Amino acid sequence: MTARMDKRFAELKAEGRPALVTYFMGGDPDYDTSLGIMKALPEAGSDIIELGMPFSDPMADGPAIQLAGQRALKGGQTLKKTLQLAADFRKTNDLTPIVMMGYYNPIYIYGVEKFLDDALAAGIDGLIVVDLPPEMDDELCIPAIRKGINFIRLATPTTDEKRLPTVLKNTSGFVYYVSMNGITGSALPDPSLVSGAVQRIKQHTELPVCVGFGVKTAEHAKVIGGSADGVVVGTAIVNQVATSLTKDGKATPDTVQAVATLVRGLSSGARSARLVAAE
């Protein structure tokens, strides 16, 4: 639903603060624990949830998210179960936007039309599919938009002025600026470079620009949130899950609470990065 996403960003703009966008891996380390994490995210201050779709060959992800995907797959997580996670979450939360993030192969195998219908029924608001370039928009992007599901595109430091309009052409919901080249979990980029990149993208679109890669602490969220419409945190959350598990990768009574504690701190940082509210 594009309306839920648009409403959330409008509310945040009125409040004069950036969104805190939190990523976690669906099914890590098991279904019930990941549902508990998902429910805890908004309560801890997350404004938008990115729901990871586990995949056996996640080429753009760093070691932490790769391991999270492996734990989820080992626990029996499937794309169908990841959609069910969203549906179960929606039973008690109809306000927080959910963006599914992952790779095209599981969606292709599931069936594009069936996936989009099931995603819509589960309350999914947007998709980020990292290995589908704009040249393949007819595969999933255009059908998703026709169904009313946002298709969020990634921009990087190497997305130049010539390429940017192509990247943004069918993008909706928000633009996800990957603040450095490489895999997820890298170090925090230079804030001045991030600010310049956000302004450059905004010259080409009216969509919100959210920045990810390298954000791990409340201070990071505050610094990056000072120039962006949203701050995306993924690896830090996935690591928090991992460190709470038993030696054999099972959840403990502390797993959900450990994530909630981290997100509360990140939320505090993001909320202190005051943006200029709309007149």
From Swiss-Prot:
Q: Which CDD domains match?
A: Tryptophan_synthase_alpha
The record's similarity note reads: Belongs to the TrpA family.
User: Where does the record place the catalytic residues?
Assistant: 50 (proton acceptor), 61 (proton acceptor)
Keywords, alphabetical: Amino-acid biosynthesis, Aromatic amino acid biosynthesis, Lyase, Tryptophan biosynthesis
Q: What is the lineage of its organism?
A: Bacteria, Pseudomonadati, Pseudomonadota, Alphaproteobacteria, Hyphomicrobiales
Main EC class of this protein? lyase
Name assigned to this protein: Tryptophan synthase alpha chain
What does this protein's UniProt record list under function? Answer: The alpha subunit is responsible for the aldol cleavage of indoleglycerol phosphate to indole and glyceraldehyde 3-phosphate.
Q: Which organism is it from?
A: Rhizobium etli (strain ATCC 51251 / DSM 11541 / JCM 21823 / NBRC 15573 / CFN 42)
Q: SUPFAM superfamilies, from UniProt?
A: Ribulose-phoshate binding barrel (SSF51366)
Q: Which HAMAP family match?
A: Trp_synth_alpha
